[in-house]
UniProtKB/Swiss-Prot annotation:
Belongs to the Fe-S cluster assembly domain superfamily. MIP18-like family. One of its GO terms (molecular function) is iron-sulfur cluster binding. This is Fe-S protein maturation auxiliary factor PG_1777. Keywords: Disulfide bond, Iron, Iron-sulfur, Metal-binding. The grpE-dnaJ-PG1777-PG1778-PG1779 genes are co-transcribed and may form an operon. The keyword NAD does not apply. Pfam families: FeS_assembly_P.
Amino acid sequence: MNNEFLQTEEDIVRMLRTVYDPEIPVNVYDLGLIYNVDVGADGFVTVTMTLTAPNCPAADFIIEDVRMKVESVKGVKGVKIDLTFEPEWNKDMMSEEAMLELGFL
């Protein structure tokens, strides 16, 4: 992997940390909603993610925000969002920072 590729991945993670579920004061990355980010050599990115619940009322907003933020990263040519509920999200997927913010630690 070259430095430019690694920089793109870091920039994507940085942008994902600016996406919030409107009902929870923690970003989607630290909530554990992002399962995988695949950056292709061609600049196309696939984000595999979930939501806290299948019937999340903010689903469309969150998914579109993820897409727009990732597309804004230098070097990204396009973004595909794969929404999955396998495995089902649970609070153990959160980062330590998220658990502290939400009072679980």
